Every structure is written in C-alpha cells, then in structure tokens.
C-alpha cells in the first residue's frame, strides 16, 4: 500500500557498545530552522532530536547539530581515561572539514567504514536496520488501514505521526536490549564490549533509502 504522494525523512540512529540507544535524529523535508518547524517540533516526543533540510538529508549543518545535541552530551559522560570511538561510513557530510574538526575537538577517534562495506560490517546497518524498518512498516500499515484506506486519503502521514512511529519503534527495541547488543557481536566487534576494554564506542551509519534512512 502507498499514498499518491511521498515525503522524505532521514532517521539517524546512534547506539553504543554497551547497548545504549542514544536519542535519534529525524530530518524532515523543509526549510532549515524555519519558525513553523521549530514550533511544531516542540510538540514532538522529547526523547529525540528534530531538524529540517530541503531534501531531508544529513548535511553539514545537520551533522554539526547532531554532534552538539547527541554526541557531545554522551561523550561528556565518559571517564577521563576513556577514548570514545565513532564509527562512520564514508558519506560526504562525515568527511567535511568542519565536522572532522569538531569531532577532534570532542576528543573522539573516528573509524571510517570503506565504501560498499556498510551493509556488511556496520553495527547499526547489520543489526538494527531490519528490526527498525519492520516496526516502522507495521505502524505504517496500521495507519494506512485506519486512516489511508478508510478515509480515502492520498496524503502522506503527518510529520508528527512519523515522529511517534520512530519513538515507538525505538522504545520497542530498547525494551529488547539484546537487539542492540547483538549488533556488536558480528564481524569482530565483540572486543568493544569486552569488560576489560578501556574504550567505549559509538556506532552510526547513513543510508540513502527512500522513506527510511538509518545513520
């Protein structure tokens, strides 16, 4: 099922090697920092972070905002002897000089996953992509049955609906802690969750799929 109109949204999901799910970043189509969006976002679930971008992509501005709102607060909780490691793919906004500089200023090391390897060895992509999309798809189907088909709507769901779906999906996965931790138990990432390690890890991935993108 589908509507006759589509809108993009990027969902940036960030997990840590201890099984923590950090606030997600939702990037909707729209004017960056528009007054309407800011007012609207104030009514959304508070556990996530929201931005607008013309094409709903992660760009330099959104990436810097993510580092300020999500990455920096988490890094600040790390003990002094811990060196956080950020896993990123080769997406262009991850390579911009301003982004690289800010990551360095936060005292974070970066491990880049080579192009074409994200779906093979990126923890978020390998371990969370499918369960997250499954939960989003289920809520989409329920919406189509209850709103789309019954009322004959041809418009896509409201941004608030999507924000709630993401929130619900994250709560479900958070409640099933093994989903997040198991994402690290593949492709030699288990050393990150070794009790003796002196490094913590933050894993992210950016994927350009229409309708749902997982960072």
Language model: regions and residue ranges:
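Electropositive, glycine- and tryptophan-enriched low-complexity nucleic-acid-binding patches
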Residues: 1-80
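Acidic, serine/proline-rich intrinsically disordered regulatory segments
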Residues: 16, 47-49, 55-56, 68-93, ...
């Amino acid at each position: 099922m589908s509507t006759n109109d589509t809108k993009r949204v990027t969902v940036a999901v960030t997990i840590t090697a201890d099984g923590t799910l950090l606030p997600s970043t939702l990037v909707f189509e729209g004017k960056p920092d528009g007054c309407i969006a800011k007012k609207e976002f104030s009514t959304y679930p508070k556990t996530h972070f929201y931005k607008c971008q013309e094409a709903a992509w992660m760009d330099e501005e959104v990436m810097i905002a993510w580092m300020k709102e999500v990455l920096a607060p988490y890094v600040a909780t790390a003990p002094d002897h811990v060196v956080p490691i950020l896993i990123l793919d080769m997406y262009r906004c991850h390579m911009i000089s301003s982004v690289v500089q800010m990551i360095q200023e936060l005292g974070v090391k970066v491990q880049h996953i080579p192009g074409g390897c994200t779906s093979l060895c990126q923890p978020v992509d390998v371990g969370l992509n499918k369960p997250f999309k499954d939960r989003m798809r289920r809520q989409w189907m329920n919406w189509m049955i209850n709103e789309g088909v019954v009322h004959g709507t041809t418009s896509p769901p409201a941004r608030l609906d999507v924000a709630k779906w993401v929130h619900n999906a994250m709560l479900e996965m958070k409640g099933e802690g093994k989903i997040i931790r198991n994402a690290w138990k593949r492709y030699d990432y288990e050393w990150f969750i070794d009790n003796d390690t002196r490094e913590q890890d933050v894993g992210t991935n950016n994927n350009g799929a229409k309708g749902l993108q997982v960072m």
